[in-house]
Amino acid sequence: MIIAVDGSAASGKGTLAKRLALHFDLAHLDTGSLYRALGLHLLRSGVTAENAEENKAAAAVASLDLGLADSSEIRTDAVAGMASVIAAMPAVRSAFTTLQRDFATDPPHGGGAVLDGRDIGSVILPDADFKFFIDADLEVRVDRRTRELQAKGQSVIFRDVIEDMRDRDRRDRERTTAP
């Protein structure tokens, strides 16, 4: 069984995906964490959102330490911003597409998988057995993200979270690959 959970930033798709995976004893992949891990890797290498080059970012996928996807460091605004920028790059999306499809069709412990991310149901797994699209009002998503960051001890300015969320939504809507 393959389940795809798609949706906007901070809409709750990760929470739903984790609960489905636990309930049905399926492997889970938060595909956004892959982009965040690559974003963290690039930031550590001195690359910024302003100077990120598509081919270099895509090439970095092959040598990416996937353990970074489990790091708490990927949940910062800087990493989220970088992830949003590189996620708009067709070569980066292509590099991750194979990895995500392989995970879905051959999950770590067999039995099926739940994948969540922004284009999982439409692009990565269009033939998934079950597909969900999760969305919420901007205010609800900003509140969720603010509480998440505060719970991690980060100083948060509500206005900055709103601006960041609007910017991410705009980049997601306007990207030519998997908007």
Describe every region a protein language model picked out.
Residues A10:
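Walker A (P-loop) phosphate-binding loop of P-loop NTPases
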Residues L34-A113, S122, E139-D143, R147-A151, ...:
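ATP-dependent small-molecule kinase phosphotransfer cores
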Residues I3-G7:
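Hydrophobic anchor at the beta1->P-loop junction of P-loop NTPases
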Residues D129-F133:
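Short, well-ordered beta-strand core segments
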Residues G14:
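Walker A/P-loop
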Residues A21-T31, V47-T48:
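Post-Walker A helix-loop "phosphate-sensing" segment adjacent to the P-loop in P-loop NTPases
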